[in-house]
Amino acid sequence: MNYYSTSIAKLIEELSKLPGVGPKTAQRLAFFIINMPLEEVKSLSQAIIDAKEKIKYCRICYNITDTEVCNICSDKERDHSLICVVSHPMDVVAMEKIREYKGVYHVLHGVISPIEGVGPEDIKIKELLDRVKNGNVKEVILATNPDIEGEATAMYIAKLLKPLGIKVTRIAHGVPVGGDLEYTDVVTLSRALEGRREL
């Protein structure tokens, strides 16, 4: 039996599609939204539409941006000879929160996962190799998640980079196996970056 009007039921259904939002949270959010002033609801909807329509990928690092080149890649103060490779744009946010890393990034947009049908050609590995070959890169830090797929991806990339004579390191210490960088606290992530090891 459906206790809601069609429009509320539809809103709850759509909110339930968001990651980490179950039926009860979706219901709570839906009722919060319908009690918001109309102008705030319109502003929220417009912000979602704008983000979806205007966000693109940086042509250098593939992080999300609303310009051709992201703020990090266009920052002359950053060390462009140091590239930190991460799986997802949210990992860049996690790394930036520690305020210690002064290099640039490369976002893979996934990890190698044969079970999910994701191979090296499905993520931005070729683009990383092209960038390293064409740039003045001294070190690549592999900061994929410390789970099976993240480790496999890091080892695969390290194997491809070794012949190029570039220092390849892996973050270590404190990032739990099976954990996500996105949820790792700032101190742990900072120590992991400091304790990176060469591969």
UniProtKB/Swiss-Prot annotation:
Gene3D superfamilies cross-referenced by the UniProt entry: 3.30.60.80, 3.40.1360.10, 6.10.250.240, RecR Domain 1
Zinc finger (C4-type): 58-73
Assigned keywords, A-Z: DNA damage, DNA recombination, DNA repair, Metal-binding, Zinc, Zinc-finger
Matching CDD domains: TOPRIM_recR
All residue ranges annotated as the Toprim domain in the record: 81-176
Family of this protein: Belongs to the RecR family.
NCBIfam families: recR
Name of the protein described by the UniProt record: Recombination protein RecR
Protein's organism: Thermoanaerobacter sp. (strain X514)
